């Protein structure tokens, strides 16, 4: 609840600053006089921006199960499944969250993810490849990392951040489109083709810039989840798991699941700005530096 209030307050503060700036610069009266109601536009952008993000969050477990082919363990069928469920249960208790659903998805790659609407209604899933490749201690560290994602509320946090950036991308792109339509193309009635073309281009450009912000937050949450995994499973085990991942070069999860997996693909140069995960070398170094 505190997280939601914080981000709504942040969103409101940005809106107020933006509105005041536009008023001081004479932009708001000009836009209003030329047929653009900023209050209505902002409400529309917020409803659409947050609506899409929160709906995605609400159906995230269902989507993950369908897209990844996750088999939820209702009753453990063997010793491995029993160990997996009990490990998640122990870490969930230690982290003070409700017991997540536990599942396995059929992939030879070494990976895992967590998703869900809130801390007490989550899903933690690991790949078959992880279970067959990693040692128990390494796998437990990966599970601890995913439980830490849930305990830290990372799914909700990133959904709210995405909602904020969605709102401002939609809001600013329509202002830009309206201004170009009125000032450059001298369209006095309604909105012509210039508005829609400019709006789409502005949404694309602003959306790319906004994704850099979201990805930066995602990378910071990974460092925190690593520390959480180290706290639950042991620092040595967490470092060993990351080193194993580095040696295996794991295939990344699909885009919608990547932010909550254990590993991300490597990238250099500008591509680093769009990474959901920090490089494994940086994550290992950060953990080694923790006292």
Curated annotation (Swiss-Prot):
Free-text comment on the cofactor: Binds 1 zinc ion per subunit.
Name of one Pfam family that matches: Peptidase_M48
Active site annotation, chain numbering: 146
Keyword Ligase: no
GO molecular function: metalloendopeptidase activity; zinc ion binding
A GO BP annotation: proteolysis
Names of the cofactor(s): Zn(2+)
Family recorded in the similarity comment: Belongs to the peptidase M48B family.
HAMAP family: Pept_M48_protease_HtpX
Annotated protein name in UniProt: Protease HtpX homolog
Natural source organism: Thiobacillus denitrificans (strain ATCC 25259 / T1)
Organism lineage: Bacteria, Pseudomonadati, Pseudomonadota, Betaproteobacteria, Nitrosomonadales
């Amino acid at each position: 609840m505190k997280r939601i209030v914080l981000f709504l307050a942040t969103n409101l503060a940005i809106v107020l600053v933006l509105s005041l700036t536009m008023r001081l610069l004479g932009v708001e009266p000009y836009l209003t006089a030329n047929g653009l109601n900023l209050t209505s536009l902002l409400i529309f952008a917020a409803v659409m921006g947050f609506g899409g993000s929160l709906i995605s969050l609400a159906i995230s477990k269902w989507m993950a199960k369908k897209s990844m082919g996750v088999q939820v363990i209702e009753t453990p069928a063997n010793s491995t499944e029993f160990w997996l469920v009990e490990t998640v249960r122990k870490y969930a208790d230690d982290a003070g969250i409700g017991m997540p659903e536990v599942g396995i998805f059929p992939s030879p790659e070494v990976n895992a993810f967590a998703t869900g609407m809130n801390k007490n209604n989550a899903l933690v899933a690991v790949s078959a490849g992880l279970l067959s490749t990693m040692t128990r201690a390494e796998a437990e560290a990966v599970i601890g990392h995913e439980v830490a994602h849930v305990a830290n509320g990372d799914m909700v946090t990133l959904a709210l951040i995405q909602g904020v950036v969605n709102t401002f991308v939609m809001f600013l792109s329509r202002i830009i489109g309206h201004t170009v339509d009125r000032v450059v193309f001298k369209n006095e009635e309604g909105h012509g083709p210039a508005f829609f073309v400019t709006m789409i281009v502005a949404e694309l450009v602003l959306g790319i810039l906004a994704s850099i912000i979201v990805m930066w937050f995602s990378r910071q949450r990974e460092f925190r989840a690593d520390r959480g995994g180290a706290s639950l499973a042991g620092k040595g085990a967490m470092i060993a798991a990351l080193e194993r991942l580095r040696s295996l070069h794991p295939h990344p999860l699909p885009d919608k699941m990547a932010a909550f997996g254990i590993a991300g693909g490597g990238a250099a140069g500008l591509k680093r700005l769009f990474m959901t995960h920090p490089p494994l070398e940086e994550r290992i170094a950060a953990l080694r530096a923790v006292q």
